[in-house]
């Protein structure tokens, strides 16, 4: 799996430039954006959502039940009573 570092090396730019292009931030010339996008495509780079959430101090609940099903719930996606149900599910599967 390609990393941000791999994309930066291939495009000949810094990791912060790659990040700015991926996050569609200002301050990057169009020619540089094209080089980075080409490198992303060549490497098959896919941003890591978990890492992004950690950086943004966002969190989620991930639970695997007895059948192997995985439940992923992003913070703020549930009401208080629903959180209680998720906690109960966790307790049942410990």
From Swiss-Prot:
Gene3D superfamilies: lambda repressor-like DNA-binding domains. Residues 1-56 form the HTH lacI-type domain. The keyword Signal does not apply. InterPro entries: HTH_LacI, Lambda_DNA-bd_dom_sf, YtfJ_HI0045. CDD domains: HTH_LacI. It comes from the Bacteria. Keywords: DNA-binding, Repressor, Transcription, Transcription regulation. Residues 4-23 bind DNA. The keyword Transcription applies. One of its GO terms (molecular function) is DNA-binding transcription factor activity. Repressor for the scr operon. Binds D-fructose as an inducer. This is Sucrose operon repressor.
């Amino acid at each position: 799996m390609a990393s941000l570092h791999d994309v930066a090396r291939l495009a000949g730019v810094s990791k912060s430039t790659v990040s700015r292009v991926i996050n569609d931030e200002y301050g990057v010339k169009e020619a540089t954006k094209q080089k980075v996008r080409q490198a992303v495509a060549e490497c098959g780079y896919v941003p890591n959502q978990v890492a992004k959430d950690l950086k943004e101090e966002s969190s989620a609940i991930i639970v695997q039940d007895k059948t192997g099903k995985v439940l992923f719930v992003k913070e703020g996606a549930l009401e208080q009573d629903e959180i209680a149900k998720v906690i109960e599910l966790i307790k049942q599967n410990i």
